[in-house]
Amino acid sequence: MEDKPLNLGGHEFQSRFILGSGRYDLNLIKATVEHAGTQIVTMALRRAQTTENSVLDYIPEGITLLPNTSGARNAEEAVRIARLAREVCHTDFVKVEIEHETKYLLPDNAETIRATEMLAKEGFVVMPYMFPDPIAARQLEEAGAAAVMPLGSLIGSNMGLRMRDFIEIIIANAHVPVIIDAGIGRPSQACDAMEMGADAVMAYTAVASAGNIPLMAEAFKHAIDAGRAAYLSGLGKVTEGQAVPSSPTTGYLH
């Protein structure tokens, strides 16, 4: 089955892997992006604003930049950061991140909805990071989100899809792409997310903390592609408490 491109605010992408760039050695970024096969890289505005050794100088040409509003504690701060990012990165894409507690770094859905509505009215392609509440996901759609990005588990935790049940509800009811963000720690977890119907996966910590960063990025690429293909092909039915023979049970030789 031929797949359709990932559509974000009218922009089409073949890759369904979004790569973070927060703590890499700058000299590794180009190789990591190339091994990942990604077309979208996200970064904090402060990393792009550095006058010397800006991350922007190391990201290959043709990559779509997705600046985030990391550090924002409310909608107004997120909007201010997004406007600065538009000037610095020359893009309308923005990943809204609003967290006002530092222990668990959970996104504030109410402020995120407010910021999404404000930024969508200004022509941004808004991709909000959210706690996986299906009601909030619908409200973000109504506010103008181009995609929703529910966390799989605590950011940076590598714990995988701890919020699976709620994410499945979001996927089943979404009219915009659902991108799993935060907590994906292994390629197998990224594959699992794609098998359950996610439109894309964002990973950063799992790649950045690997012994061989470019190779791990490539592993995620293949896992995401495999999970997408499995989803499109139609997964086999799971049977509980009984075996299903894989060979004929009649016509034996006597």
Swiss-Prot record:
GO terms for biological process: thiamine diphosphate biosynthetic process. It catalyses: [ThiS sulfur-carrier protein]-C-terminal-Gly-aminoethanethioate + 2-iminoacetate + 1-deoxy-D-xylulose 5-phosphate = [ThiS sulfur-carrier protein]-C-terminal Gly-Gly + 2-[(2R,5Z)-2-carboxy-4-methylthiazol-5(2H)-ylidene]ethyl phosphate + 2 H2O + H(+). GO terms for molecular function: thiazole synthase activity. Pathway: Cofactor biosynthesis; thiamine diphosphate biosynthesis. It is found in: Cytoplasm. Keywords: Cytoplasm, Schiff base, Thiamine biosynthesis, Transferase. InterPro entries: Aldolase_TIM (IPR013785), Thiazole_synthase_ThiG (IPR033983), ThiG (IPR008867). It holds the Pfam family ThiG. Belongs to the ThiG family. This is Thiazole synthase. The active site is at residue 95. 1-deoxy-D-xylulose 5-phosphate binds at residues 156, 182-183, 204-205. GO terms for cellular component: cytoplasm. HAMAP family: ThiG (MF_00443). Its main location: cytoplasm. It comes from Bifidobacterium longum (strain NCC 2705). Its EC number is 2.8.1.10. It comes from the Bacteria. Catalyzes the rearrangement of 1-deoxy-D-xylulose 5-phosphate (DXP) to produce the thiazole phosphate moiety of thiamine. Sulfur is provided by the thiocarboxylate moiety of the carrier protein ThiS. In vitro, sulfur can be provided by H(2)S. Homotetramer. Forms heterodimers with either ThiH or ThiS.
